[in-house]
Amino acid sequence: GQGVGVCEGIAKAVKVLLDALGVWCVIAICGNNPEKGIKYRHTWNIVKINGTYYHLDATFDNSLGKDHENTEIRYDYFNLDDKSIFRDHEPLIAPAPKCEEGDHFYYKEKKLSFTKTEDVYRRALQTAKKGRVFTFHWRGGYLTKAVLEELLELIQKAGKEKQKNARISLNWSQAVLRFDYVEDHGEVEPEVVVEEANEGEKE
């Protein structure tokens, strides 16, 4: 099928690149799940950094951030532990190393993984002022509906202070939010898009 070649080709390309750089890397494979509308198997990579294993799924990252005019690279699946990756990946069907730490998760390394709502608000104010796109990961407990509503309110409030409306996209399973602001032309409802990674492998 057409969906199979995409992730397999990307995972093999990542392995070739990492092999060339001397980074240990294998290909992971999980099953399909017709009940969930996942009609193909999926492949990605497991890498080893300083003796610790992490999941790296370039296919899922490549499928995100295509809303609006923005096509910036995403890192939601860059060095995840088992707990995080299997929130939206099916179980493995071939043996692979356990990935038990998240220390090198991209957003954590870049200090873009927040546990306090005030940090989100502070960065939202900066984003509204500078007119940029901002992506962050939430790790202040589970991203429940109540927590999400609080974060969305703060992001919108920061925009209102600069007479701007927020455009927000959400990768809920990985607790990653991305937003920017547009000029406020009257009472426009803030736009929230729920992104689903790797839509190409679903029915």
Regions of interest found by a model, annotated:
Residues 3-7:
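Alpha-helix N-cap/helix-initiation motif
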Residues 8-82:
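Hydrophobic/aromatic-rich core segments of domains that either
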